[in-house]
Design a protein with these regions (language model features):
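Hydrophobic alpha-helical membrane-interfacial segments at the cytosolic entry of transmembrane helices
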Residues: 16-25, 193, 216, 229-255, ...
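Membrane-interface helix-loop-helix junctions at transmembrane boundaries of multi-pass membrane enzymes
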Residues: 12, 224-239, 323-362, 405-413
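Membrane-interface coil-to-helix junctions
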Residues: 27-122, 146, 150-165, 275-303, ...
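Membrane-embedded helix bundles of polyisoprenyl
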Residues: 24-28, 115-133, 137-223, 239-252, ...
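Membrane-helix boundary/interfacial segments in multi-pass membrane proteins
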Residues: 44-47, 155-162, 300-311, 346-389, ...
Length: 559
């Protein structure tokens, strides 16, 4: 038996591929319901506003590629800072889509398309990988569901760069298939997909790179033990080109972030920050509050977590049962099953981060010496790699039960078949959750009339996400900005404009070079009281004040 499972004989039939694509899309549409009814007017958001930020980021990348590709890092936000795109997670892979359409309306539709595509590709990638290691269609379906709809992913639905993980299993499928079939084109395609996955950010990219490195080491050891068998020249060339492409893109993408750490010391993740986000063992027993089946049941465990959004790692009961069965499935080689179980345990352990004393001892070493490891802000997202292993084992578990139907006869066989289909449905239902839809507020007329650079008030992390999203309309320079870093510049700016319009804040903004301040009354706690006091102070300072809709526009200069 092959050490990595019986290879799929020949190409997968076109009918199966067509059914796979349609089925994966249908599952994604149903799981995200009713998003399909609101593609142009709502965003899936858990309340933190991250989709607003990613919508803008995709649009900015495309805008910069067309207008000033060499200045892509200098966005229209965080004015007057430069190189500020690295304050965000890298997310370039979907940017070409933003070449179609412009403005906030197109940004919403584009984001929702990517959101639906993420779930679709995750299922397809895991399905194909499961088929390649020797599972039948039913086992591959279970693997696809267990990966794309793992319960822990529900709280990550607002993080498009986390749920866009389908490139991981798809890469493994293409590489495994390519090397087995000695098809250089598939091998190169695997490395291209790996590079694309890296382009979606280091959140998954770093752990994925280490996975590929570990697999490479295992392959080299196997090759040496096998007596150094001859490798076809086309495979060597495809591998070399692929590695250069993957490494080259990774280095190019990483350089601005490495330079940022030299420029801003606060850009490096601290162990205190990692400790805050690290889950304890209780994270494995806590499902998202939005989980339809397990949210309420696991609430007592979830309430003990510091930051549940990043610490709910519940794998699902059906997954646990199927993984246990799959670990002893004779249809897969023992070596492969051992590798999958070992990978699951190791990556699951690392996902605890600084959450336990044992995991801290290991994670701290990686944090200090492993290149790039200190950039991982939330260790729980390492569950992506754990889920690759658990999904394949879960698929093997269902395949084992499916194959055992041969021992049934008469009426019991259809009953057994129905029971396994029901189990597959339960596996999927365990990973379903409610993701609230957020309707983006329309771009205020005041922004269209204001002269940039603009400061929007009030300002905080939530408000600034909306202002950044609004700036997709024309990309005016704005002083506001929000990213994944807790920048001292941003803290000081927000503190200094808290009393606007007063002498100190106006003087600071004029020195900064801001030309317009827009105060959005609907975002103030007591707009009437604020407006009355602000009007008097603005008059004393000689500021030009205009009411435009539900916004107040202040001109800071006379030019």
């Amino acid at each position: 038996m092959e050490p990595l499972g019986r290879p799929q004989e020949g190409a997968i039939a076109r009918t199966e591929l067509a059914l796979l694509a349609v089925g994966a899309l249908v599952l994604s549409l149903v799981a995200s319901w009713p998003l399909i009814l609101h593609l142009g007017d709502s965003l899936p958001d858990l309340g933190f506003g991250d989709p607003y930020l990613f919508s803008w980021q995709m649009a900015w990348d495309a805008h910069a590629l067309v207008t000033a590709p060499l200045e892509i890092l200098d966005t229209n936000t965080f004015w007057p800072l430069s190189g500020d795109l690295v304050f965000q997670d890298a997310f370039h892979g979907f940017s070409p889509l933003a070449l179609i359409g412009e403005g906030t309306a197109a940004a919403v539709i584009r984001y929702n398309f990517v959101y639906l595509f993420a779930g679709t590709l995750a299922f397809i990638g895991a399905y194909l990988l499961a088929r390649e290691i020797g599972l039948g269609p039913i086992g591959a379906v279970a693997a696809g569901i267990a990966f794309a709809y793992a319960p822990w992913r529900i709280d990550q639905h607002t993080h498009i760069h986390v749920i866009s993980s389908g490139g991981v299993p798809l890469t493994l499928f293409l590489l495994l298939r390519g090397y087995r079939a000695r098809r250089a084109g598939l091998v190169l395609a695997g490395w291209v997909v790996a590079t694309w996955q890296m382009s979606l950010g280091f959140t998954l990219g770093i752990q994925f790179a280490y996975l590929l490195f570990a697999i490479g080491i295992v392959c080299i050891v196997w090759w040496l033990k096998a007596g150094r068998p001859q490798v076809a020249a086309p495979l060597i060339r495809a591998t070399a080109v692929g590695i250069v492409l993957f490494a080259g893109w990774t280095i190019w993408q990483a350089l601005p972030y490495l330079q940022l750490q030299d420029r801003l010391p606060e850009a490096r993740r601290t162990t205190e920050e990692l400790g805050f986000y690290s889950p304890g063992l209780g994270g494995f027993g806590a499902a998202s509050e939005n989980n339809l089946l397990w949210g309420e049941v696991t609430e007592p465990v979830r309430e003990k977590l510091r930051w549940p959004t990043e610490q709910t790692l519940f794998p699902g009961v059906a997954t646990i049962v199927l993984v246990a069965l799959g670990a002893r499935f004779a249809g897969l080689p023992k070596r492969l099953r051992s590798l999958l179980v070992g990978s699951l345990l190791v990556t699951g352990f690392l996902a605890l981060g600084f959450g336990t004393s044992a995991s801290t001892a290991v994670y701290e070493v990686l944090y200090e010496i492993a290149p790039g490891w200190d950039a991982i802000r939330t260790p729980g997202r390492l569950m992506t790699l754990a889920t690759v292993a658990s999904s394949l084992l879960a698929g093997a578990g269902l395949q084992r039960l499916w194959d055992a139907r041969g021992g049934h006869s008469g009426r019991s066989r259809p009953l057994a078949t129905g029971a396994l289909i029901a189990l597959t449905a339960v596996l999927w239902f365990e990973g379903l959750g409610t993701t609230p839809l957020s309707t983006p507020p329309p771009v205020p007329e005041a922004q269209q009339l204001a002269r940039p650079p603009i400061l929007h008030l009030p300002t905080n992390g939530i408000h600034d996400r909306v202002y950044t999203f609004w700036s997709t309309e024309g990309f005016p320079e704005i002083v506001n900005g929000v990213g994944v870093l807790d920048l001292r510049h941003t803290r000081e700016l927000r503190a200094s404009v808290r009393g606007f319009p007063d002498g100190s804040s106006v003087a600071m903004l004029r020195k900064l070079g801001a030309r317009t301040v827009i105060v959005h009354l609907d975002r103030l706690e007591d707009p009437d009281a604020w407006l009355q006091a602000a009007t008097e102070r603005a008059r004393d300072l000689g500021l030009d004040e205009r009411i435009v809709g539900r916004s107040i526009v202040y001109e800071l200069d006379d030019n």
